Amino acid sequence: KVIEEVGAGATVDIEGVLYVLHNSNNGGASHAFISEVAKTAVAGKNIVISDYVTYNGKKYPVTEMRGNIFSGTAIKSVKLPSTLTEISNSAFRETPITEIVIPASVKIVQGSTYYGCKNLTKVVFENDVMDEVHGCFQKCINLKNVKFPRRVGLMSYDMFEGCVNLTEVMLPENLSEIYSSMF
């Protein structure tokens, strides 16, 4: 259902997930980003975020998640769209998800994205190259192993702080510096 229409697009609610749609008025690409969720509407559910949102006959690719979208919600699982390019800070902070597949389209994973996801045991990066991965797995106490993409432009500190059961990490081939606070 449409929440609000504005000159540059609209805000649309699809099963408790709010998408902000932007038109390409200035030569840029039309796109959508996820702005917030209704915590009670997504509780206990397997969330599938579509690659596109169609509104007034136009398809908008879902390219970003902004802010702490699912933070603190009781989502059961989430499937991210293959059009997503960036996952924001604290997007899944302290949720009960058990695994996450980061689509090949994602170039940036911001800090604290999976902070405190105590049930998280599996992380899959579908891409072989990423621009940035920031400290995103802090306090994931059941995370045992992670295999990063072959090449990552930037990895920041606090990546695995508090991951007490971590036994194996396969770091990118091109990594030239490991921050002392990475683990």
Model-derived features: where do they sit?
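Structural signature of tandem-repeat unit edges
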Residues: 23-25, 41-64, 72-86, 95-108, ...
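Extracellular, surface-exposed repeat architectures
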Residues: 37-40, 136
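Short beta-strand/loop segment at the start of cytosolic alpha/beta domains
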Residues: 3-38
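Generic hydrophobic alpha-helical segments
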Residues: 32, 132-133
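Low-complexity/repetitive intrinsically disordered segments
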Residues: 1, 177-183
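Conserved "repeat-terminator" motif of extracellular CCP/Sushi domains
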Residues: 1, 136-137
